[in-house]
Amino acid sequence: MKLIKNGKVLQNGELQQADILIDGKVIKQIAPAIEPSNGIDIIDAKGHFVSPGFVDVHVHLREPGGEYKETIETGTKAAARGGFTTVCPMPNTRPVPDSVEHFEALQKLIDDNAQVRVLPYASITTRQLGKELVDFPALVKEGAFAFTDDGVGVQTASMMYEGMIEAAKVNKAIVAHCEDNSLIYGGAMHEGKRSKELGIPGIPNICESVQIARDVLLAEAAGCHYHVCHVSTKESVRVIRDAKRAGIHVTAEVTPHHLLLTEDDIPGNNAIYKMNPPLRSTEDREALLEGLLDGTIDCIATDHAPHARDEKAQPMEKAPFGIVGSETAFPLLYTHFVKNGDWTLQQLVDYLTIKPCETFNLEYGTLKENGYADLTIIDLDSEQEIKGEDFLSKADNTPFIGYKVYGNPILTMVEGEVKFEGDK
């Protein structure tokens, strides 16, 4: 058994003194003071905040096929360092988890290497080519969390509609990277004033919002839970808000980088600022914040997307899309939204715990007696600088290097086992 002493937990929106007794994988007791018994392993929280473990429904672990960028081991170590106890990896690997054989192989890699709980997606279509549906019932039987072709949009309405019908039959969500290929126009960043200034091809807002508009109507017809990945535009927020008001089962996520940065933050032709969807306008960012606060957007997910340094050293036109985010999400959001009074600590924690779990009907995301001992101890008071050399991820492709932040996790526990502690 383990006993966390001298911690603080959120109760009714306020930090309250609490000890947490852990028996095996579950929390046995939460109380203001618990006397330790002989032989118990005591963890001194030293007055720090003890949060439910965070749940990230959108990461890229790259394995199999892209191990030079990230592995399941390094990606989940990075997640633990960031306070995440559950992550859901996208299927844009090689091979794609699009069959029982491929999914079983992926699950074995997870079982052998993961440092946190991993709930893998299966693809919607074979090899994510958008031409042939996978075997939904067989993949659910193997443990598919949900279905997505993330990394690309499903281009034909008929294929998406048929996929939604199959997903509804097995009571799983269709999770969509929304991007109409005919509207990308070879873009490498947001189509706006900054792309014009830099002379870099831009991706217009409608590239995303048009496909969301199509899909919410398909989801309504199919009776399917439809989840929108990394919303980035004001038009997308409007479409999702209207769909929810119409009673369509649509949910959505937003990334930390789209909440924190805009096209105006891009200093030049620097691929560290290249992600998909791209950093949008100030108006778009404001719409995302409004949508998150009013419930149009359900939760925050990182879209952790590691790449090798030489890949991101290329010009924006040639470099791959994506930035890492597992190790920086909470500190950045806490520093920029909670410490300045825009959000409460409870709001931020909910966006990373209860909200994603409610979105996908998961049994995690809370600290409660008889619940899983998934938690992270966070130092809310000490300032640290984000340094790439401190990352446990293989990659450090993020524009947030050098930022000074508060709210750094100092210990993370998954099902009662310590998976990250300080610099270990």
Swiss-Prot record:
The active site is at residue 303. It catalyses: (S)-dihydroorotate + H2O = N-carbamoyl-L-aspartate + H(+). One of its GO terms (molecular function) is dihydroorotase activity. It comes from the Bacteria. Binds 2 Zn(2+) ions per subunit. GO terms for biological process: 'de novo' UMP biosynthetic process; purine nucleobase catabolic process. It is an enzyme of class 3 (hydrolase). Its EC number is 3.5.2.3. Gene3D superfamilies: Metal-dependent hydrolases, Urease, subunit C, domain 1. Catalyzes the reversible cyclization of carbamoyl aspartate to dihydroorotate. Belongs to the metallo-dependent hydrolases superfamily. DHOase family. Class I DHOase subfamily. This is Dihydroorotase. It comes from Staphylococcus aureus (strain MRSA252).
